[in-house]
Regions:
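Alpha-helical transmembrane segments and their immediate interhelical loop/hinge regions
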Residues: 13, 151-267, 271-279
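Membrane-interface starts of transmembrane alpha-helices
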Residues: 61-69, 126, 130, 192-195, ...
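Hydrophobic alpha-helical transmembrane segments of membrane transport and translocation systems
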Residues: 274-354
């Protein structure tokens, strides 16, 4: 008993482990910009790996396939930029300049509608402070942009980090075997073999998600641009379509963010234009939800919607808009580890899934969490 009482509550080894953990956490926080770049690189690598694998099956060297894929991407993006870039930039500049006037016009219409309902101006100011609401919207948008801006150290730093992410992703895909072998060998047996088996399904799920999401957003952007042009908003159609397409990369919240600028512009053109634009977005969003997402994204993210929403909110809180885009595919990849290394063994032990191939599929496993 006396020896137990005299025993130190915190051993030297535990103290060293605690200090090392704190030091590692501080180091990771200081290197968060590099970590974000690595996160982007992994997502990009997972997205292009299937294309490289196809080229490799056609007897192309893997390094040559990686270079070919990137040259094709750069050529495509350059062509699109030269084709629509000047018009898009001009429309965005005009939209940024004139949008505050449209917002003031919108609030004026709201006040007029409230007065028709018998609500006095003093009651409007008391319960619905439009000026404070406008300020909150502007500040919230600035905070989101500043979060992403700080992480990437400004615009030039962001461009540099994006280029670095592309280069790193190319290296990851080209040297996949050596890289994976080096990482999993850091873990003792049998975990090294178990983790090596999870690399392919993780890459497939992350890559499938980002490929589908980018393709769906591109289709949505083109559809909205064409629709707004037909409805008489050709002056801002390209900019509003690009905004809607980019924000659509963000699950759940993105479609809502994308429709707001278009509706603000539309209502200044009249009530009928507003209704037609609203109908356009409703049709396009339903087409995405019931046709494009099941067809192109499918079940690549087999995670409960609540967890996906929390991933978006958490990513936005830490990394701004950038986090809302890159965190969900990481959650999708992490779900593979959770399913295969914890949920499936647990359900097998409980007899709820079968060991036979094809029985106890991922869908049935995912439905348990």
């Amino acid at each position: 008993m006396a020896s137990q009482l005299n025993r130190p509550l915190l051993s030297v080894s535990n103290l060293l482990l605690l200090v090392a953990t704190i030091f590692l956490a501080i180091l990771l926080w200081q290197l968060r910009g590099l970590l974000v770049t690595l996160m982007i690189a992994v997502v990009l690598a997972a997205a292009i790996a299937p294309i490289v694998n196809i080229a490799e099956r056609w007897r192309f060297p893997r390094w040559l396939a990686v270079i070919g894929v990137y040259l094709t991407l750069v050529a495509g993006l350059t062509g699109v930029g030269l084709l629509v870039g000047p018009t898009l930039i001009a429309q965005i500049e005009t939209l940024v300049r004139i949008l505050p006037l449209y917002i003031d016009n919108l609030f004026g219409l709201v006040e007029q509608f409230a007065l028709k309902l018998g609500i006095t101006e003093s009651e409007i100011e008391q319960f619905f402070d439009l000026q404070a609401l406008t300020g909150w919207i502007i500040r919230s948008g600035q905070q989101l942009l500043v979060s992403s801006y700080d992480i990437t150290t400004g615009i030039l730093g962001g461009i540099f980090n994006l280029i670095l992410a592309f280069l790193l992703s190319g290296y990851m895909v080209a040297g996949r075997e050596n890289l994976i072998s080096g990482l999993v060998n850091l873990f003792p047996q049998p975990w090294s073999d178990r983790l090596a088996e999870q690399v392919e399904p993780i890459a497939r799920r992350m890559g499938g998600y980002i490929q589908g999401r980018v393709l769906v957003s591109a289709i949505l952007s083109v559809a909205i641009t064409i629709g707004l042009g037909i409805l008489g908003l050709s002056e801002f159609a390209l900019a509003l379509g690009a905004i809607a397409g980019f924000t659509n990369l963000i699950p759940f919240l993105g479609p809502i963010l994308g429709v707001i600028p278009a509706l603000v512009v539309a209502i200044s053109q009249g009530g009928w234009t507003f209704l037609w634009v609203l109908l356009l977005f409703i049709v396009v969003q339903n087409l995405e939800t019931y046709v494009l997402d099941p067809l192109l994204v499918g079940s690549s993210v087999q995670v409960h919607p609540l967890y996906q929403l929390l991933a978006v909110l958490g990513g936005t809180q830490v990394l701004g808009i950038l986090g809302a885009v890159i965190v969900p595919p990481w959650i999708a990849g992490a779900s593979v580890l959770l399913e295969n290394l914890y949920l499936r063994p647990k359900l097998l032990a409980e007899g709820k899934v079968s060991r036979e191939p094809g029985v106890g599929s991922r869908e049935s496993i995912c439905s348990n969490w």
